[in-house]
């Protein structure tokens, strides 16, 4: 259930400026969990380019992107990334919630929304990773039905260094893979 006044909607062409503002406002809040970003990342122009790139991925059926909005401002974001078809039928999920919006179940709602969309795309599983110390994000994943599957050493370059991550997965269904789907995608 989404907290009152919030909406999760698909990323849209005009979202670049609002995303840039959200990233600027949450720069310190997100810094421990994000890659080191160049200054240009925080501009409306850079975010508009990123939005256009993501929308191409979405249009190709290779991912999904949604924003959490309150009062017309971006309060968070969730993406389905790295869609792999064939015999894997998998994707990864990434998400963040702005500092002023934490503790309301919003991250869990966004992840659950992405899982519903992943099922619509016909995916079998979704994976996620968190830094070892990011216990709030680990709780989000467990609440959304993910299971912990292990530790990946030096998994991602976050906050200026290679960092270990706890890996999670959520299996969406146990149906057999349609051979025509595996061959086409």
PLM feature segments, named:
Residues 141, 146, 168:
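Conserved active-site tyrosine of GNAT-family acetyltransferases
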Residues 95-97, 103-116, 120, 135-143:
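Conserved acetyl-CoA-binding loop-helix of GNAT-fold acetyltransferases
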Residues 1-92, 98-100, 162-163, 167-185:
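GNAT-family acyltransferases
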Residues 72, 105, 122, 134, ...:
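Conserved G/P- and acidic residue-centered "switch" motifs that form tight phosphate/ATP-binding loops
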């Amino acid at each position: 259930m989404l907290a009152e006044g919030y909406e999760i909607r698909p990323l849209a062409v005009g979202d670049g400026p609002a995303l840039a503002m959200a990233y600027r406002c949450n720069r310190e809040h997100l810094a421990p969990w994000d890659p080191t970003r160049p200054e240009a990342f925080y501009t409306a122009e850079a975010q508009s380019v990123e939005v256009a790139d993501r929308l191409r991925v979405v249009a190709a059926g290779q991912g999904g992107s949604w924003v959490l909005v309150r009062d017309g401002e971006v309060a968070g974001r969730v993406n389905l990334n790295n869609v792999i078809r064939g015999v894997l039928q998998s994707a990864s999920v990434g998400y963040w919630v702005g500092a002023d919006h934490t503790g309301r179940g919003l991250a869990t709602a966004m992840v659950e929304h992405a899982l519903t969309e992943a099922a619509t795309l016909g995916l079998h599983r979704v994976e996620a990773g968190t830094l070892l110390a990011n216990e709030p994000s680990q709780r989000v994943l467990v609440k959304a039905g993910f299971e912990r599957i292990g530790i990946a050493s030096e998994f991602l370059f976050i906050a200026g260094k290679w960092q270990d991550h706890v890996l999670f997965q959520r299996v969406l269904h146990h149906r057999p893979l349609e051979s025509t789907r595996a061959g086409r995608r």
